[in-house]
Amino acid sequence: MRREVFESVSTNASNERVHVAPKIAAEEQDYEEKECTEENSLSQNHKSSNVITENDSKKKNLDEEDDCSVASSMKNAKSKVTHGTAPRFRSAQRAEKRKEYYQKLEEKHQALEAERIELEQRQKEEQEAAIKQLRKNLKFKANPVPDFYYQRPPVKPELKKFPLTRPKSPKLNLSRRKSCSDAITSSGEENSNSQNRQSVVE
């Protein structure tokens, strides 16, 4: 029994040793890492201190330059005397420009209005011409009636043309009393004239 207990203790001790060794190695690594981080932090602190000192020196230089510039500006202000000047207003120029702009705008509006009126008149004329043409086309055009619809006038009979009579001078009786011989001769002449007339009429 004693041997078994001793062996178990010895085995436990050997196991503990085996387990203790890696713990020590890990602690050594942590210590080395801490040393490295401390060295890095020291170097960074040193660099930051250098940067701070440089910034402080720059600020000091800027403050000195500001003081110098303020002093020089004060000297210049004391040496120069400002004279009051009346303000320059550009209202007249602006009014002229505004007037020109409004004038151009008005001309543009007038041109557009004239163009619109002209376009309306042209459209109205075109519509009236189209309406007139349509009315002309809608009218019924009468064709001429054929000749056989007309009644011809009756035929006039031809008149015979008779020869013209020859005028004769009338014989005036100067004396109321006529002798027998004169009466016979006059009656004979009248008979001959009447015969001639009848022959001409036939």
From Swiss-Prot:
<keyword id="KW-0493">Microtubule</keyword>
<feature type="region of interest" description="Disordered">
    <location>
        <begin position="142"/>
        <end position="202"/>
    </location>
</feature>
<feature type="region of interest" description="Disordered">
    <location>
        <begin position="1"/>
        <end position="97"/>
    </location>
</feature>
<keyword id="KW-0206">Cytoskeleton</keyword>
<comment type="similarity">
    <text>Belongs to the TPX2 family.</text>
</comment>
<keyword id="KW-0175">Coiled coil</keyword>
<dbReference type="Pfam" id="PF06886">
    <property type="entry name" value="TPX2"/>
</dbReference>
<dbReference type="GO" id="GO:0010091">
    <property type="term" value="P:trichome branching"/>
</dbReference>
<dbReference type="GO" id="GO:0008017">
    <property type="term" value="F:microtubule binding"/>
</dbReference>
<feature type="coiled-coil region">
    <location>
        <begin position="92"/>
        <end position="143"/>
    </location>
</feature>
<dbReference type="GO" id="GO:0001578">
    <property type="term" value="P:microtubule bundle formation"/>
</dbReference>
<protein>
    <recommendedName>
        <fullName>Protein WAVE-DAMPENED 2</fullName>
    </recommendedName>
</protein>
<dbReference type="GO" id="GO:0000226">
    <property type="term" value="P:microtubule cytoskeleton organization"/>
</dbReference>
<dbReference type="InterPro" id="IPR027329">
    <property type="entry name" value="TPX2_C"/>
</dbReference>
<dbReference type="GO" id="GO:0009825">
    <property type="term" value="P:multidimensional cell growth"/>
</dbReference>
<dbReference type="InterPro" id="IPR044806">
    <property type="entry name" value="WVD2/WDL1-4"/>
</dbReference>
<feature type="compositionally biased region" description="Polar residues">
    <location>
        <begin position="182"/>
        <end position="202"/>
    </location>
</feature>
<dbReference type="GO" id="GO:0055028">
    <property type="term" value="C:cortical microtubule"/>
</dbReference>
<dbReference type="GO" id="GO:0007163">
    <property type="term" value="P:establishment or maintenance of cell polarity"/>
</dbReference>
<comment type="function">
    <text>Microtubule-associated protein (MAP) that regulates the orientation of interphase cortical microtubules. Able to bundle microtubules in vitro. Modulates both rotational polarity and anisotropic cell expansion during organ growth. Promotes clockwise root and etiolated hypocotyls coiling, clockwise leaf curling, but left-handed petiole twisting.</text>
</comment>
<keyword id="KW-0963">Cytoplasm</keyword>
<feature type="compositionally biased region" description="Acidic residues">
    <location>
        <begin position="27"/>
        <end position="38"/>
    </location>
</feature>
<feature type="compositionally biased region" description="Polar residues">
    <location>
        <begin position="39"/>
        <end position="54"/>
    </location>
</feature>
